[in-house]
Amino acid sequence: MKVLEGKRALVTLTRGMTELSRLVATTYGPNGSKVAVSKNGRVLVTTDGSALAHEVRFRDLHRLGASLVRGASTKVDRASGDGTSTTILLTGALLEAALDHYSPRTWNPVAIARDIQSYLPAVEGLLTDMSCSPDESLLERVAEMASHGDKVVSEHVVNAVIRVGENGTVLIRAGDGVGIEMDHREG
């Protein structure tokens, strides 16, 4: 059994988290790159940060750090239906910033957590100021970006979002055949 203590343990744990964050960052946004991951003889090529985060595995103690971030992103996904990549990227950035301020005498994870939480109202205010009511044109642009320019897919997504309304949920799954089907359920 390998035991690490102090800054060495913190750096090792954080490195797994930040490595996962950097990998997911390469897939992020409309210009995100494709990443290939080989696992058990099968290769996954994806621009989906969430799929990548759940498939990639690290060695040694870095694995533990990555699994902690992966778990946090899964909780966000369950609560909101999205946000896994953003959760991983923000967590990685916060951890790197916290590690820059590490000192064995002053290191206090609870104080760091409180400090981060103290910024939440300001961040929420900024996000509220930046938010806008989505019109059909904005939905089309977002859907087209998310579908990597596939107009057919983006049109179906926009139609589904408009159909379920602001508080509805759209679930997209890979089908058995070729083509796109839309199934609407009430309740």
Label for each model-derived stretch:
Residues 1-186:
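N-terminal glycine-/lysine-enriched basic segments
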